[in-house]
A protein has these predicted regions:
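A short beta-strand segment in extracellular, disulfide-stabilized domains
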Residues: 303-311, 429-432
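Fold-level signature of zinc-dependent metallopeptidase catalytic domains
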Residues: 23-175
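Proline-centered linker/hinge motifs at extracellular inter-domain junctions
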Residues: 285-290, 319, 388, 410-413
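A cross-kingdom C-terminal cell-surface attachment/processing module
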Residues: 521-536
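The catalytic-center signature of Zn2+-dependent metalloproteases
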Residues: 112-136, 174-258, 324, 329-333
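Extracellular acidic, Ser/Thr/Pro-rich low-complexity tracts
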Residues: 299, 310-315, 392, 434-441, ...
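Extracellular acidic loop/turn motifs
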Residues: 313-320, 328-333, 381, 395-396, ...
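Exoplasmic/lumenal beta-rich domain surfaces
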Residues: 110, 320-380, 449-473
Length: 537
């Protein structure tokens, strides 16, 4: 049947035929089937060595690898029971995996010639058991399909097998090696991104040399599945090589985001370089994006901050950006332990955006005064390392790193007044904040800028810039319609800021006039004051 996928307003939309053949399902990625029933994958082989940071993907070359994908009889039966139906399902799967690998690591897969000879239709006579033992059987099946008389499976660089009951299992860094067929994925519902991304792209990532990126140890994140040298993501993590949805209370979300962490890209590109003679190189008319993460800073503990970078592309391609924390530390073992202990990662991986900025903790968390899972206040004297990564969508991926030194001054830089008092448009308002030692070394913030938002942080109006970081300043509240607002005090030459914890009411100043206007003004103000007092009571 017809299969399609496209991007709509930054979200992936899929079109797949219903199994009864009586129509089509159109759905967003996050509405796909849930992840594989709390099944963890396993990694076979030695752990990859820790790598130094490097330019990720140049963008002017793409590697094409030939892949052989075997299908157990149960997988083929799920998709209609014929070789043609099984081959069509594998083609749909590969199209989705290709989209991710082309964009993130400049690699793509071409199905091996004669792949139909390793798609089995009979569950009783096929060479597989529909479990994780199929990974060993697959090595033999694919070797025999190339060597036995009467078979016609062509040469390939990487092999995999799909079934409906085996979970995930793969050899680490086996692409273009003698163990190249050591990869398998199984699910009772082998369709959609829960299968294509969470499992198949994940297991092939292992075959490319990428290890797990989660730092949690509950649920399936336990049992030795955490890899300390690559545990960049809090809790279950959310990138492809993490374990979103199968780590119990440490789950950040139900399914993986369809993106690799930059550290996974490093590992995969390193293995691709080690087997550089394998695969076919394709020249691209493309330049890698340019990206700058900005300067290093010193900030106070328990205080929000915003990371700001910049990017450009010689080809004028629209860029997408991710800010990732790249710190390794102590594993977490519960939600309560996902806090700052001086070493562990504090901030989760999030999907790329069109702007090279990220507010930490996230703005929704600040507005609700409730941290999202996968966010924690930097509370100790420590160093935070961050990476800005830019993607051009064509395989060009560039990154730049910066660091933040966190200093616990004993207090948070925080707005202290007004907290509930309404604001009067057109009138002078005094804003107070706790300096928290930020005007002294080593932070040395001497000036602050004061802002107001009427739309919960979508837009900010500058009220006064370059004011002394003394803890108090007077500003004029802009004229405008009645409503609500929040205030912000931000260090002029640093990243940290303080924001109103609650919405503040804004009312219009009533101007006096001739005749009875003065009396009207008096009674209007009196009634307004009475209303304020009732609201505060």
């Amino acid at each position: 049947g017809f299969h399609a996928m496209f991007s709509h307003q930054g979200r992936m939309v899929f079109v797949d035929p219903l199994r009864n053949g009586e129509g089509y399902a159109v759905y967003y990625q996050q509405d796909a089937h849930s992840r594989l029933e709390e099944e963890a994958d396993r990694v076979i082989g030695s752990k990859a060595s820790k790598l130094a940071r490097q330019v990720l993907v140049d963008g002017n070359e793409r590697k094409r690898y030939v892949i052989a994908i075997s299908a157990a009889g149960e997988y083929t039966q799920y998709h209609g029971g014929t070789v043609e139906a099984g081959l069509g399902a594998i083609t749909t799967l590969l199209n989705r995996v290709n989209e991710v690998y082309q964009r993130d690591v400049a690699a793509e897969f071409q199905l091996a010639s004669g792949n139909d000879t390793i798609i089995f239709t009979d569950t009783a006579t096929d060479p597989f058991n529909n479990d994780d033992g199929d990974i060993d059987a697959n090595v033999t099946v694919q070797q025999n399909a190339q060597t036995q008389a009467g078979t016609k499976l062509g040469p390939f660089d990487i092999g995999h097998v799909v079934n409906t009951g085996g979970g995930g299992l793969a050899g680490l860094g086996v692409l273009c090696t003698a163990e190249k067929s050591a990869g398998m994925t199984g699910s009772p519902n082998p369709v959609g991104d829960a299968f294509f991304i969470d499992y198949v792209a994940h297991e092939i990532g292992h075959q490319f040399g990428a290890d797990h990126t989660f730092n949690g140890t509950t649920g399936s994140c336990g049992g030795g599945n955490r890899e300390a040298s690559q545990a960049w993501e809090p809790g279950s993590g959310s990138s492809i090589m993490a374990y979103a949805g199968i780590c119990g209370e440490e789950d950040l979300q139900a399914n993986s985001l369809p993106y690799f962490h930059s550290k996974s890209i490093e590992q995969m590109r390193a293995h691709m370089a080690r087997v550089a003679s394998c695969g076919t190189s394709q020249s691209l008319t493309n330049n890698a994006p340019q990206v700058a993460a900005g300067n290093d800073y010193v900030i106070p503990a328990n205080t929000p901050f915003v990371l700001k970078g910049a990017g450009a592309d010689l080809d004028q391609d629209p860029l997408s950006y991710t800010w990732e924390q790249i710190d390794l530390g102590t594993e977490s073992f519960s939600v309560a332990s996902m806090v700052d202990d001086g070493s562990r990662p504090l901030f989760r991986f999030v999907a790329p955006t069109s702007a090279p900025e990220r507010t930490l903790p996230s703005l929704p968390s600040l507005l609700t005064n409730t941290l999202a899972k996968g966010e924690a206040w930097p509370a100790t004297n420590r160093e935070l390392n961050f990476r800005l990564t830019a993607r051009d969508g064509k395989g060009g991926v560039s990154s730049d790193d910066m660091k933040i030194q966190v200093v616990n001054t004993g207090k948070a830089f925080a707005l202290t007044s007004p907290l509930v008092t309404p604001l009067a448009a057109g009138q002078t308002q005094t804003i107070d904040w706790d300096v928290a030692g930020t005007n002294a070394a080593p932070i040395n913030c001497s000036k602050v800028d004061l802002y107001m938002t009427r739309d919960e942080g979508v837009n900010w109006t500058l009220l006064a810039g370059g004011q002394p970081n003394s803890g108090s300043a007077s500003v004029t509240i802009p004229a405008g319609s009645d409503g609500t607002a929040r205030l912000k005090v931000a260090c002029s030459d640093n990243l940290f800021f303080a924001i109103s914890p609650l919405k503040l009411s804004v009312t219009q100043r009533v101007e006096g006039g001739g005749g009875g206007g003065g009396a009207l003004c008096f009674w209007t103000l009196a009634l307004a004051l009475l209303g304020w007092q009732r609201r505060r009571a």
